[in-house]
Amino acid sequence: MANSSKERLCGAGAPLGHANGFPPSVYPFAFSGGIRRSPPFEVLANGGFFRSFPTDLPKEMASLSLTMGAAERSAHSDCISTVETQSTSSEEMVPSSPSPPPPPRVYKPCFVCNDKSSGYHYGVSSCEGCKGFFRRSIQKNMVYTCHRDKNCQINKVTRNRCQFCRLQKCFQVGMSKEAVRNDRNKKKKEIKEEVVLPDSYEMPPEMEELIQKVSKAHQETFPSLCQLGKYTTNSSADQRVQLDLGLWDKFSELSTKCIIKIVEFAKRLPGFTTLTIADQITLLKSACLDILMLRICTRYTPEQDTMTFSDGLTLNRTQMHNAGFGPLTDLVFSFADQLLPLEMDDTETGLLSAICLICGDRMDLEEPEKVEKLQEPLLEALKFYARRRRPDKPYMFPRMLMKITDLRGISTKGAERAITLKLEIPGPMPPLIREMLENPEAFEDGAATPKPSERSSSESSNGSPTGEDSSGSKTP
């Protein structure tokens, strides 16, 4: 019986954990996940394998168990010698039960708004929203105004309604200005010490010059948020309506001014005016909504859920809806929120706007190859600049480019919205807005849309896509 057992255990054809001559269905439950990964026969030492079986073993298995005990005491069996060499105690094979994970740390609710706290920030328990609001307010030296009695209730529902009272509440509960300043200085020092730019980020002089020109063109045609004197209006601020005519008049006026600034931006881009007038018009009409959306979305303030126009007018989400955005509103605000993690500066926004504009895949271009050649250095410039600015985040450049696809989708829906908007406004669509839309015939029944090549002869005499005549007035 012993010899038979040895043959069963040491047979060359026996797979790991399976004794020849016995069906595998008898004992597979004895192998835990850890045992299956053990060296061959490791679990046989000290009867550890059979200890895991129930007491009512089949007769053959009980006999094999006794034989195994005798075989392990034999020092002259080659097979058993191998078993003893590789065996370990059964105690070593039984994994100790893992210690339970520590309970999650629970913080007191946010001292400012009573929302769920994410930890202690600037001296007190606070949520991410109030932490970010306090940090930005201190770093940017923001000055807020309360339109009531300077005693507004601040909670997680009302915290965005009055910045003045929210900031005062931050101070009242103990948030520290100095903690913000020290944290900022510490981060600056760490960045200065740790970030060493590799030689590959050294730009050629011509690329540096291109970046400076594009950045200057953007900044001089689109003031940044911190440069604006923000003001608000109470017009239809709390409830969505189909259209607020007062807000629409203001919005259409500001949009017209923005379009003029985009044309000015385009004319200042290196190489743009070397294109044919027809191609300049095609590119501007195709990309104008893209750039308008990109620009307004960079002026999004998440704490107040507002957007600010170039004259400082600041509208909340409801007012933007009522001003004419309508069903497009939430899509635009969602895109603005997605831009925040990119932390794009003016130079990156300008370069991305230029790439949106000078794009060789637009329809009806006369010289698409020339347009593509103008776009190539802009792509390289944005790639180099983004990597030089964030050497530890090489993925930022492709993420920025992906936003162009999102912008085109929004612009398509924006053009559709303009068609329905025509039915809601009492008068005609402002001429420059109408001109910049890709399908102006939608606003005039039976009107034929001239192709850029057909219009170039009449507009080239003015020398400008905006149609400036010799007196300086603009004609749509």
Swiss-Prot record:
Query: Which InterPro entries does the annotation name?
Result: NHR-like_dom_sf, NR_DBD_RAR, NR_LBD_RAR, Nucl_hrmn_rcpt_lig-bd, Nuclear_hrmn_rcpt, Retinoic_acid_rcpt, Znf_hrmn_rcpt, Znf_NHR/GATA
Please give the Gene Ontology molecular function terms for this protein.
DNA-binding transcription factor activity, RNA polymerase II-specific; nuclear glucocorticoid receptor binding; nuclear receptor activity; RNA polymerase II cis-regulatory region sequence-specific DNA binding; zinc ion binding
- Segments for region (Hinge): 176-205
What is the residue range of the motif Nuclear localization signal?
Answer: 184-189
Region of interest (Disordered), ranges:
81-102, 435-476
Composition bias of kind Low complexity appears in: 81-96
Top-level taxon = Eukaryota
Membrane-spanning parts: none
Where is this chain compositionally biased, Polar residues type?
462-476
Provide the leader sequence positions: none
Question: Which Pfam families does the entry link to?
Answer: Hormone_recep, zf-C4
Q: Which residues bind DNA?
A: 110-175
Q: Does the keyword Zinc apply?
A: yes
Please tell me one Gene Ontology term that the record gives under cellular component: nucleus
Identify the Gene3D superfamilies for this entry.
Erythroid Transcription Factor GATA-1, subunit A, Retinoid X Receptor
Q: Where is this region: Modulating?
A: 1-109
Report the record's Gene Ontology biological process terms: cellular response to corticotropin-releasing hormone stimulus; regulation of transcription by RNA polymerase II; retinoic acid receptor signaling pathway
Q: Which UniProt keywords apply?
A: DNA-binding, Metal-binding, Nucleus, Receptor, Transcription, Transcription regulation, Zinc, Zinc-finger
Where does this protein reside within or beyond the cell? Nucleus
Q: What is known of its domains?
A: Composed of three domains: a modulating N-terminal domain, a DNA-binding domain and a C-terminal ligand-binding domain.
Give the protein's biological function. Receptor for retinoic acid. Retinoic acid receptors bind as heterodimers to their target response elements in response to their ligands, all-trans or 9-cis retinoic acid, and regulate gene expression in various biological processes. The rar/rxr heterodimers bind to the retinoic acid response elements (RARE) composed of tandem 5'-AGGTCA-3' sites known as DR1-DR5.
| Self-association state and partner proteins as the record states | Heterodimer; with a rxr molecule. Binds DNA preferentially as a rar/rxr heterodimer.
- PANTHER family tied to this protein: NUCLEAR HORMONE RECEPTOR, RETINOIC ACID RECEPTOR GAMMA
Q: Supply the name of the protein.
A: Retinoic acid receptor gamma
Source organism phylogeny = Eukaryota, Metazoa, Chordata, Craniata, Vertebrata
The coding gene here is rarg
